[in-house]
Amino acid sequence: MTSASTEPFFNRSLADTDPEIFGAIGKELGRQRHEIELIASENIVSRAVLEAQGSIMTNKYAEGYPGKRYYGGCQYVDIAEELAIERAKKLFGVNFANVQPNSGSQMNQAVFLALLQPGDTFMGLDLNSGGHLTHGSPVNMSGKWFNVVSYGVREGDNLLDMEAVQRKAEETKPKLIIAGGTAYSRIWDWKRFREIADSVGAYLMVDMAHIAGLVAGGQHPSPFPHCHVATTTTHKSLRGPRGGMILTNDEDLAKKFNSAVFPGLQGGPLMHVIAAKAVALGEALQPEFQDYAAQIVKNAKALSETLISGGVDVVSGGTDNHLMLVDLRKKNATGKRAEAALGRAYVTCNKNGIPFDPEKPFVTSGVRLGTPAGTTRGFKEAEFREIGNLIIEVLDGLKVANSDEGNAAVEAAVREKVIKLTDRFPMYGYMG
């Protein structure tokens, strides 16, 4: 094979090599540019993060950890991983960080592998109260391999029932208690959770995947020094690539987590993603990230207040973080219908169960809304109040139509307003 024969492989563009995938990416770029992203677990990464993740680091196998690899030629990917580790430690004020987990589920599985045996008891927030699949859902590995004791929110105010957490912990003596969730809009009392964990001899694990950016930005109390271990994804409010991290101050636990990630669960880490994690963590260490985190919360409060003023119920009466659960029953809508109608109006969100939801999981009585992606675009309170009013327009139109097809006229009118709004806040201009 000559250099002439390999030249196309190394230099042919995606558009020329695979026009179908190129076309799909182009359409997705258009969707992201023109639609308002309100999915609470999504965000928009910087060009620098994209460049790192799309780099030649993807070519390198690097089983093991920096300085202790099972492959040669790792001296430069070691630099990337060491930077990611040091930046994570600095950002969250901890002594140990593992940046290799490929996802949020795998980071949580690694903690289970390190601290639990099959059949052990652990406690986690019930999925219907805002927990995550990996916190003990019966359809998830966590619910199949372990004895799960779920806690939840109180009926009425929809706030965490800490007395019930204490009582269940005393009754069941769990080995691990998980605090944190995916759809709880209030401040977590880490200190109280640690007191409960200590009272029954349990480890306290905090899954701060959703709020890590707020913790880093000073908008939510840090789980340290209260927790034994914290896990977080690197996307969501941290605004990095999709992946996970495990953080702790305990050296013995850190060794267990490292062994659980590799070789316990994973083989070669995704070095291009780890490089991108390092970039995102570096961005989060800049002073402007504090402003970004503060704006996320301001925007969430503005959106929540606008919806409530428009006759829409928000679970627990508001939000202290980046997200809110909207109870649609007063609008005679389901989450499934509302998600579809808002999507047709170029407002993207996800249907979501609400506490004590009478509807099926694929229907739901609510939608979950979040502000991180819109805040990244530059939206402030005024824009989120406008967005709140647009959501109300769609929901009111849906109520009048009372059908899965929605209200085409209202949705078309809102769609035009959304395009005008998003055109004022362009993204990725260099992509053409």
UniProtKB/Swiss-Prot annotation:
The keyword Amino-acid biosynthesis applies. Gene3D superfamilies: Aspartate Aminotransferase, domain 1 (3.90.1150.10), Type I PLP-dependent aspartate aminotransferase-like (Major domain) (3.40.640.10). It catalyses: (6R)-5,10-methylene-5,6,7,8-tetrahydrofolate + glycine + H2O = (6S)-5,6,7,8-tetrahydrofolate + L-serine. One of its GO terms (molecular function) is glycine hydroxymethyltransferase activity. The record marks H235 as: Plays an important role in substrate specificity. It comes from the Bacteria. It is an enzyme of class 2 (transferase). PROSITE patterns: SHMT. Its EC number is 2.1.2.1. Its cofactor is pyridoxal 5'-phosphate. Catalyzes the reversible interconversion of serine and glycine with tetrahydrofolate (THF) serving as the one-carbon carrier. This reaction serves as the major source of one-carbon groups required for the biosynthesis of purines, thymidylate, methionine, and other important biomolecules. Also exhibits THF-independent aldolase activity toward beta-hydroxyamino acids, producing glycine and aldehydes, via a retro-aldol mechanism. This is Serine hydroxymethyltransferase. The gene is glyA.
